[in-house]
Amino acid sequence: MSTYTRPVMLLLCGLLLLTLAIAVLNTLVPLWLAQANLPTWQVGMVSSSYFTGNLVGTLFTGYLIKRIGFNRSYYLASLIFAAGCVGLGVMVGFWSWMSWRFIAGIGCAMIWVVVESALMCSGTSHNRGRLLAAYMMAYYMGTFLGQLLVSKVSGELLHVLPWVTGMILAGILPLLFTRIVNQQTQARHSSSISAMLKLRQARLGVNGCIISGIVLGSLYGLMPLYLKHQGMANASIGFWMAVLVSAGILGQWPMGRLADKFGRLLVLRVQVFVVILGSIAMLTQAAMAPALFILGAAGFTLYPVAMAWACEKVEHHQLVAMNQALLLSYTVGSLLGPSFAAMLMQNYSDNLLFIMIASVSFIYLLMLLRNAGQTPNPVAHI
């Protein structure tokens, strides 16, 4: 049977449209808040509110999928995300935008859980890696195109919200023409998120997802603000964010092939080390293009390698629970990263954004080095 079946392709098409909308909002919301003269710590709190919504959405989507299936869960998630988008135009203010971004965060997390779980459950041990790679490519391509849109269109709030909302609703259309069936067989014992988080053999993968959340959450939430403080216009900010994300797209397949050949432990070490180098290079402000490129290539590919590490440690019937656990870990990191980095930037210097990213990456590198002789070195299937 073909890996890229009709339901899979339609699902990825819908994801591409939704990710476009997510990328546009994640870039422009911090800028809209800055234009409203909100302090940096409040900008960070709004970003954290979005990731708090991710946390909540991740927790209950597995139960929702079991009750109403993949298709209806996907429709509901998209409508919740659209509501969070429309709400931004109703009231402009710190507390109202915290609420709407929280709602949008719930919808986005539900979308990710539904899409990832559907791909994992429709695949086998022979093609699940290719499905995951296709998922990451679609996700990052949507993010890249979203950044380009920001650099080409008007960034005014009331100009952006109508077409972004339309794009979210258009993301529902592909799944109206297919039905995604859960081919996963019923397990004798249901798996829980907490059980997945406690697996010792998957701990490096879980920790990697947390670190990835800190790194990417901080970059998504605060990099536009950092660039704004450097005196850049919205179009330039969109361009540099596109450079960051395009590096992540280009790095997906090479990192997967390297992990397949040399093992995930070595690849994770190299990725984390390159994130540290990219952060240090950003502090020098001498060559932002190569610095952003290597930061994106390493930072954006950390999550799938860490995720593949953990998923290889569980049985087929545990994949949805493990997927939820990894998304939960990523979301916790995404919640903590922008909040802490925003406080550092507000009270001290914008450069502390990259110092924090380098510091947490160094801690994870120490974990990888310390566990070298204790943890098996699984080979990737991406």
Swiss-Prot record:
Gene Ontology MF terms: transmembrane transporter activity
Gene3D superfamilies associated with the record: MFS general substrate transporter like domains
Transmembrane domains' residue ranges: 8-28, 45-65, 75-95, 102-122, 131-151, 157-177, 204-224, 231-251, 270-290, 291-311, 325-345, 349-369
Top-level taxon of origin: Bacteria
Protein's cellular compartments: Cell inner membrane
Swiss-Prot/TrEMBL keywords: Cell inner membrane, Cell membrane, Membrane, Transmembrane, Transmembrane helix, Transport
Membrane topology category: Multi-pass membrane protein
GO terms under cellular component: plasma membrane
Annotated NCBIfam families: PRK03633.1
Protein name: Uncharacterized MFS-type transporter YcaD
Protein's gene: ycaD
